[in-house]
């Protein structure tokens, strides 16, 4: 007896219908953009700065002009900024503390983070021909504010303004600004008259006043910790202006 072969199964109506396409799930990664730190970030967590001034004696001896160098430190004695003065060689010998200049502020890596420009202004307490004004740029080329002198016959006053001209602080000093056997403070107030800080020029003794004051000196500024870094930079610039105005001999 002949055996019948098994029937051949019919081909599927659609070729490869039994092959399923693999399901691939692609997770979309979320890119987190970290904001670039502000160029003045070193001031973000400080509430006081201590400044040491040193005259570059070699420049004076070799007739290269009178130029200062400043070292700005925190309360922990960490060096924050180094400031170099730039001016024409002759103005320091004739204009003294009123000389026009530029201050280049550099951080610990040597990067210039701020520049202070001070034009010449002939100023005196009794007959102010011109009032003092400095402009602050951070980064260099971008103005963040200015410090301007207000004429008063008794107590010196200065206003701190942002780049748009809005006043944010004003500084008021004592009637006598000579640092002799006492500390000299300029108090800092906001627009509501609330004290937010002060600058201080400390008395360091009679020997220092007689022999060392023209070469090296120390002063500082204190302010509220929660101020923005631009405002802290403006107060630092105001402190430097006060030193040139009253104590640069």
Which residues does each PLM region occupy?
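Low-complexity or membrane-interfacial segments used for flexible interactions
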Residues: 1-102, 106-114, 118-133, 139-143, ...
């Amino acid at each position: 007896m002949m055996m019948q072969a098994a029937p051949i199964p019919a081909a599927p109506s659609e070729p490869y219908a039994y092959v399923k396409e693999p399901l691939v799930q692609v997770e979309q990664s979320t890119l987190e953009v970290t904001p670039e730190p502000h160029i003045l970030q070193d001031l973000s967590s400080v509430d006081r700065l201590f400044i040491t001034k040193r005259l570059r004696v070699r420049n004076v001896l070799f007739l290269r002009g009178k130029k200062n160098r400043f070292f700005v430190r925190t309360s922990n004695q960490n060096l924050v900024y180094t400031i170099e003065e730039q001016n024409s060689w002759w103005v320091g010998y004739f204009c003294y503390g009123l000389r026009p200049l530029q201050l280049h502020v550099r951080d610990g890596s040597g990067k210039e983070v701020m520049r202070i420009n001070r034009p010449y202004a002939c100023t005196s307490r009794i007959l102010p021909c011109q009032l003092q004004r400095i402009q602050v740029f951070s980064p260099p080329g971008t103005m963040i504010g200015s410090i301007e002198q207000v004429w008063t016959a008794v107590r010196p006053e200065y206003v701190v303004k942002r780049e748009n001209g809005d006043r944010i602080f004003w500084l008021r000093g004592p009637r006598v600004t000579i640092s002799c056997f006492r500390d000299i403070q300029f108090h800092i107030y906001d627009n509501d008259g609330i004290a937010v800080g002060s600058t201080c020029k400390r008395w360091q003794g009679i020997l220092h006043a007689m022999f060392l004051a023209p070469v090296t000196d120390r002063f500082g500024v204190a302010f509220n910790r929660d101020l923005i870094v631009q405002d802290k930079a403006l107060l630092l610039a105001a402190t430097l202006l006060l030193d040139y105005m009253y104590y640069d001999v």
